[in-house]
């Protein structure tokens, strides 16, 4: 099944996040399947759909599944920026071979920018600001460096770009394990804001934390 076929199918169901997620999970033997729990990412996608975002920033794209989902529910003229590394080792970044596929995610008049760089570099932050024309963003998805220092730095650097009333979401907030310490950062900041959590397995893996700014 070609990406064009998937695009046409999802174009007809843009008002139905649950169906969009199902299509993405089943596409081409999981080629674009988000590294997510289906129920959790569906709940977040419903939030993003209601937000009707014009400016979206994703830190950590990997297989491209979540990036694809944001393009489906963002405005037809949205600016969407992905920041990720150039490597595809252990899902730390993605191969250059995926780049032309990801570029085809954009709908209608959407502008999709793939920034292949370290999100923690000041030059990357400045590039992201330029791509959004200096405007505040509506939705930020943080799913990059999962170390405590890494996720905290992404939060500190990019959360200030999000407008009041916007949404900031973190992936992997359910539990700390090994080098994955997102929950530690999440627990430190969540009570300072209105927030919600989507966790199918509260003591297990994954989990999504949502800040309502």
Residue ranges and their predicted role:
Residues 1-34:
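Rossmann-like AdoMet
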Residues 27-35, 39-213:
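S-adenosylmethionine/decaboxylated-SAM
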């Amino acid at each position: 099944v070609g990406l064009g076929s998937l695009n046409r199918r999802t174009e007809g169901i843009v008002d139905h996040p649950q169906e969009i997620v199902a299509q993405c999970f089943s596409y081409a033997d999981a080629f674009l399947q988000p590294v997510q729990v289906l129920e959790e990412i569906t709940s977040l996608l419903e939030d993003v759909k209601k937000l009707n975002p014009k400016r979206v920033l994703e830190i950590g794209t990997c297989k491209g599944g979540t990036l694809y989902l944001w393009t489906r529910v963002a405005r037809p003229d949205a600016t969407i920026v992905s920041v990720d590394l150039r490597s595809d080792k252990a899902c730390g970044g993605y191969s250059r071979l995926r780049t032309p596929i990801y570029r085809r995610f954009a709908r209608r008049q959407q502008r999709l920018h793939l920034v292949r760089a370290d999100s923690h570099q000041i030059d990357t932050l400045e590039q992201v600001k330029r791509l959004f024309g200096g405007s505040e963003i509506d939705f930020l998805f943080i799913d990059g460096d999962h170390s405590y220092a890494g996720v905290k730095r992404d939060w500190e650097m990019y959360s200030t770009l999000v407008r009041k009333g916007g949404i900031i979401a973190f992936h992997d907030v359910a539990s700390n394990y090994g080098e994955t310490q997102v929950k530690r950062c999440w627990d430190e900041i969540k009570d300072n804001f209105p927030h919600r959590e989507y966790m199918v397995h509260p003591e297990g893996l994954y989990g999504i934390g949502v800040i309502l700014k």
